[in-house]
């Protein structure tokens, strides 16, 4: 591959220091909160509160391990690190070479900038520590030390993964109007999980009625929104004079109590320091004889950087879909762990997988995904495919952070989650042939009686628009050996080979590689109908669902000879899957070169679309496409937010190739989209990509952060195009692309950190 590097000449002493110091992947380990609000307290004040028995008074992101990881970002002048030196001390004035009383790593020759572990035995619980780092570039010259960061170790180490405290952002309702009933009506603009605070002036004792809801009917809160769309009301007594009143949100009997719940899983409870929350956008108040002078909503959410990402394009629907899905990741972070919506508030692997990828693409935040993944290792849910998805979650964590701590901590559980114990003589796995055992289920972290294949959800129900089959599984014919389950099994084995390799477990890596090859061969032998050119639902089935072909395509199982026919079948089924299934459908379409078809699904205005959610007044993604297809759907489900990651990973084409983004791809798949630009967060810094797509040329601007190299693909309008880099002609004769692609050719080159203008014309 051709490689281009930007060469910068620097004066001696011009190097800047590293930035963005993270401890356990958390950048802000200093801010102390109380009840979700930042305070002026410092880390030592937290220790004092602990000593006084007031551990619930102050919150901070504590380090819950004696061997925390350190990460940083390189200054722009250092395109690639050749060495680092870390200092850790018990006081900031000791952060000097020769004085650091906890640890001095010495000069370490290493390109790694994330996941550097402190040796064991050096830290104590309930103690404040300070650290800094300097790095050397390829010339061996070191930068100055970075401004120090500090962290507080937990009072008792559990060996878990650290996360940030939940925060509250107080919003004031605007506009506020009076409706035909004489009630005050307030619109906060977007739905959020929050509480309510009112400033009220009353002439005497009075009682206000407060209505909260996600949906409106004109300028009133919709009291009967249907499905599981939220509506509630409260009676609020007030006393004479002016005062501020805060509603105490009632706990829900289903999502706010620890008890066995349906399939042996439990809801996540809100911590006492923030209190119970309710999802709503609108507030309507029957004021009686009192005057309400201010309506505020404290919104509860996880740490969030709105400016970490952006996307805009020439298509207004696509822009609206992106904004919907990005905001959904923020709004649904209220529990500090990924949950499946307000109805249950339970972590599920499938929800977490889409939430994880989408969160990575909209914010440089990694700890809520890591915490959720680790939580699920011992809180597995019932679907077979969800059990297998844990391996995908764990690999994504390593791929996006470069920190292998989760892989090490959960390796044995991940091995069990490949479900190799269910392998039959034909090389495939089955949950229906008597191989499930209590021991296997416990090793998978599942405490129910058995796991069951799901394919998609709901499996049956109302007839779909534009498809013949009921439910969201496209009429899937479930049997003993199912194509979707074994496609997931293959993907889990494939990734476990990589995980074992990272952890230097060579025998395991060889085993998983061999099993993956066997499963791929078995699926293509038993499930691929070579006459029809697509996959049947399982052994003995005569049904050919969308899912049976889209998962093998998304997971790279389809033989080259059958790619075109499999893609034809996938295209023919439209959006015959749920909002969850759309993640893998769009992955398959983009990876197969069907970028125009994928763009059409993303920008569809039909009932099975994200636009349908927007058009019906929602600002957070739904659990399903429409109540017609899932009658009990809710309006606060992040598993409906796949476009947040699809637009970045596939349409803009920005993905990590090597762990910690040491190498990435930038491969736009524009279809007929005229223009787009995006800022993509990574642990190394922002990637910026913009393109202009015309019949005669494809213009592209990219900015690549330090610490990585990018394999860049530039679509070309014709086979006779030439590539220009920063104004100079670089190459002619582009490579032919997949016959399904909107562009007949493309150029590939490797770029080092810097900013580039690329033009294929």
Feature-to-residue mapping (PLM):
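Extracellular/oxidizing-compartment recognition motifs
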Residues: 17-335, 351, 365-368, 405
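Fungal secretory targeting signals
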Residues: 1-16
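C-terminal capping/lid segments that line or modulate ligand- or cofactor-binding pockets
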Residues: 390, 429, 447-461, 471, ...
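Short strand-turn-strand beta-turns centered on an Asx-Gly dipeptide
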Residues: 213, 403, 725-727
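Well-ordered alpha-helical scaffold segments within catalytic/enzyme domains
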Residues: 288, 354-363, 390-406, 488-506, ...
């Amino acid at each position: 591959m051709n490689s281009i590097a930007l060469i910068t000449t620097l004066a001696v002493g011009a190097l800047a220091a590293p930035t963005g110091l993270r401890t356990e992947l958390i950048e802000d380990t200093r801010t102390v909160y109380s009840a979700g609000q930042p305070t002026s307290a410092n880390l030592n004040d937290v220790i004092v509160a602990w000593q006084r028995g007031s551990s619930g008074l102050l919150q901070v992101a504590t380090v819950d391990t004696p061997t925390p990881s350190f990460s940083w970002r390189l200054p722009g002048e250092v395109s690639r690190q050749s060495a680092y030196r870390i200092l850790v001390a018990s006081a900031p004035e000791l952060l000097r070479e020769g004085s650091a009383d906890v640890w001095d790593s010495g000069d370490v020759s290493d390109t790694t900038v994330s996941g550097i572990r402190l040796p064991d035995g050096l830290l104590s619980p309930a103690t404040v520590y300070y650290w800094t780092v300097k790095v050397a570039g390829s010339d061996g010259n070191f930068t100055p030390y970075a401004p120090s960061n500090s962290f507080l170790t937990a009072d008792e180490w559990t060996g878990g993964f650290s996360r940030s405290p939940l925060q509250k952002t107080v919003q004031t309702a605007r506009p506020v109007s009076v409706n035909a009933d004489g009630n005050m009506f307030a619109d906060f603009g977007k739905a959020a999980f929050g509480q309510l605070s009112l400033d009220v002036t009353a002439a005497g004792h009075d009682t206000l009625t407060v209505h909260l809801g996600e949906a409106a009917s004109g300028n009133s809160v919709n009291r009967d929104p249907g499905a599981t769309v939220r509506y509630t009301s409260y009676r609020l007594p007030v006393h004479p004079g002016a005062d501020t009143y805060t509603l105490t949100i009632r706990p829900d009997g289903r999502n706010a109590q620890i008890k066995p719940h349906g399939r042996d899983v439990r809801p996540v409870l809100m911590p006492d320091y923030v209190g119970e929350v309710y999802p709503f956008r609108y507030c309507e108040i029957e004021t009686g004889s009192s005057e309400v002078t201010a309506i505020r909503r404290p919104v509860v959410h996880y740490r969030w950087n709105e400016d970490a990402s952006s996307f805009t394009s020439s298509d207004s629907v696509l822009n609206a879909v992106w904004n919907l899905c990005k905001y959904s990741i923020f709004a649904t972070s209220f529990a500090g762990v990924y949950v499946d919506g307000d109805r249950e508030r339970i972590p599920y692997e499938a929800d977490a997988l889409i939430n994880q990828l989408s969160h990575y693409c909209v914010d440089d935040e990694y700890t809520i995904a890591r915490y959720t993944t680790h939580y699920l290792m011992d809180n597995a849910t019932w679907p077979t495919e969800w059990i297998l998805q844990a391996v995908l979650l764990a690999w994504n964590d390593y791929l996006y952070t470069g920190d292998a701590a989760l892989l090490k901590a959960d390796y044995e559980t991940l091995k069990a989650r490949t479900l190799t114990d269910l392998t039959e003589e034909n090389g495939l796995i089955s949950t229906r042939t008597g191989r499930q055992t209590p021991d296997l289920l416990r090793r998978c972290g599942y405490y129910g009686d058995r796991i069951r294949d799901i394919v998609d959800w709901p499996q049956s129900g109302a007839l779909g628009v534009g498809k013949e089959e009921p439910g969201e599984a496209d009429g899937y014919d479930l049997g003993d050996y199912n194509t979707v389950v074994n496609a997931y099994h293959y993907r889990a084995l494939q990734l476990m080979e990589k995980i074992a390799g990272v952890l230097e477990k060579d025998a395991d890596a060889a085993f998983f590689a061999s099993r993956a090859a066997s499963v791929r061969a078995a699926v293509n032998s038993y499930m691929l109908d070579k006459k029809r050119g697509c996959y049947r639902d399982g052994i003995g089935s005569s049904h050919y669902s969308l899912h049976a072909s889209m998962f093998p395509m998304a997971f790279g199982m389809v033989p080259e000879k059958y790619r075109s026919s499999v893609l034809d079948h996938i295209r023919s089924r439209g959006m015959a899957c749920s909002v969850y299934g759309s993640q893998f459908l769009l992955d398959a379409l983009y990876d197969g070169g069907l970028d125009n078809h994928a763009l059409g699904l993303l920008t569809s205005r039909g009932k099975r679309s994200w636009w349908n959610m927007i058009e019906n007044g929602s600002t957070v993604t739904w659990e399903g496409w429409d109540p017609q297809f899932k009658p009990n759907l809710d309006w606060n489900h992040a598993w409906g937010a796949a476009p947040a990651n699809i637009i970045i990973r596939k349409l803009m084409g920005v993905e990590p190739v090597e762990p910690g983004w040491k190498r990435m791809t930038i491969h736009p798949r524009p279809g007929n989209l005229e223009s787009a630009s995006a800022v993509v967060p990574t642990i190394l810094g922002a990637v910026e990509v913009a393109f202009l797509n015309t019949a005669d040329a494809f213009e592209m601007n990219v900015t690549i952060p330090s610490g990585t190299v990018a394999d860049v693909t530039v679509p070309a309008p014709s086979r006779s195009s030439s590539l220009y880099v920063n104004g100079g002609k670089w190459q002619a004769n582009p490579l032919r692309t997949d016959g399904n692609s909107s562009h007949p050719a493309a150029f590939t080159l490797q770029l080092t950190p810097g900013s580039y203008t690329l033009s294929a014309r």
